[in-house]
């Protein structure tokens, strides 16, 4: 996977997939992700991202078969705060957040996605990766945007709903995602 746009510096960012936040992938005829939106905020450009890094599809049924490279970070929770994603440390290894990593060339775009601009660089080895595909495609350091205060209250496991993730081909086809497949994005929250 090459750096989107060529020579600009790219940082890989962990984006948790949580309830009440939408994630829209726009896919071209060559099965490349051309645009990515998190709650309507563009993250990218993502012109060189291959669709199968994130999901496998059955084109005959216009349906997602599997999500790939789902990153899991332990000891944190995620909530939606003022239409942005807020992550906090709990230091409890039972708490976890799942999501994707995306390349970003413009860190200012992340101000519209995350409630905190406190960036922490984390080794890829600190994550569990579900359905790993294309080993070595991501940089060894991933940035996580997390608040400075630790959450010490009770947590619960939450699931995302249908239409949280939208995958649309430039031909107007929207890939269906079976409800049971969304269970891979369970996460800890308040």
Curated annotation (Swiss-Prot):
Arranged from A to Z, the UniProt key words for this protein are:
Antiviral defense
InterPro entries the record matches: CRISPR_Cmr7_comp
Q: Which Gene3D superfamilies match?
A: 2.60.120.1670
Q: Name one GO biological process term.
A: defense response to virus
One short Pfam name that applies is Cmr7b-like
The Swiss-Prot or TrEMBL record describes its family as follows:
Belongs to the CRISPR system Cmr7 family.
State the oligomer form and interacting partners. Answer: Homodimer.
> What does the UniProt function comment say about this protein?
CRISPR (clustered regularly interspaced short palindromic repeat) is an adaptive immune system that provides protection against mobile genetic elements (viruses, transposable elements and conjugative plasmids). CRISPR clusters contain spacers, sequences complementary to antecedent mobile elements, and target invading nucleic acids. CRISPR clusters are transcribed and processed into CRISPR RNA (crRNA).
The protein depicted here goes by the name Putative CRISPR system CMR subunit Cmr7 2
